[in-house]
Amino acid sequence: MHFRDFNYNFSSLIACVANGDVFSESETRAKFESLFRTYDKDITFQYFKSFKRVRINFSNPLSAADARLQLHKTEFLGKEMKLYFAQTLHIGSSHLAPPNPDKQFLISPPASPPVGWKQVEDATPVINYDLLYAISKLGPGEKYELHAATDTTPSVVVHVCESDQEEEEEEEEEMERMKRPKPKIIQTRRPEYTPIHLS
């Protein structure tokens, strides 16, 4: 066949099975396995019911490629079955690699600094002196044009409000009320109780 010229790295297929009977009924499982045993006799199956997937492990990559070419997108018990090559992940070590040291160290030095670690100086705060100067020049009752009008945009004008006399008076009255002592609440005397049977 034409595909035997290629060098395949994968010897496992992942089958996406829509029919859930493959995972529970032994007869359906035997039918499913017989489809692939024609391509390789030393084949093993791993069933993942919750994912609706079956991993099929072949003894060589050519058998896996042949099975995929013949059975991909074919019907199995009335539903389409899709086959994909399983991706193998090669990790150099059996241990997890430590995370990259990016952004692990703050400005203060860590307890055991790594090789090449240097102290970073704090940046000076950015102060906009032009803005502070403009704010200091603002006075109450005046208007300031921030942006002149053009043919397509309106002008932006700031009106600085004067403090309202009425508001100040209300605030003073409120302060006086708070300073006054609270009036004493005299409790009313409870009326005399005379039982009905005695009257």
Curated annotation (Swiss-Prot):
Note the InterPro entries from the entry: Calcipressin, Nucleotide-bd_a/b_plait_sf, RBD_domain_sf, RCAN1_RRM
CDD domains reported for this sequence: RRM_RCAN1
| Keyword entries, A-Z | Phosphoprotein
- Output one GO MF annotation: nucleic acid binding
Under Gene3D superfamilies, the record lists: 3.30.70.330
Disulfide-bonded cysteine pairs: these are none
List residues, modification Phosphoserine: 108, 112, 163
User: Has the keyword Lipid biosynthesis been applied to this entry?
Assistant: no
Question: What about PTM?
Answer: Phosphorylation increases its ability to inhibit calcineurin and decreases protein half-life.
Q: Which domain of life is it from?
A: Eukaryota
Family designation: Belongs to the RCAN family.
What is this protein's function? Inhibits calcineurin-dependent transcriptional responses by binding to the catalytic domain of calcineurin A. Could play a role during central nervous system development.
What PANTHER family does the record point to?
A: CALCIPRESSIN, CALCIPRESSIN-1
| Subunit structure of this chain's protein | Interacts with RAF1, PPP3R1 and PPP3CA.
What name is this protein filed under? Answer: Calcipressin-1
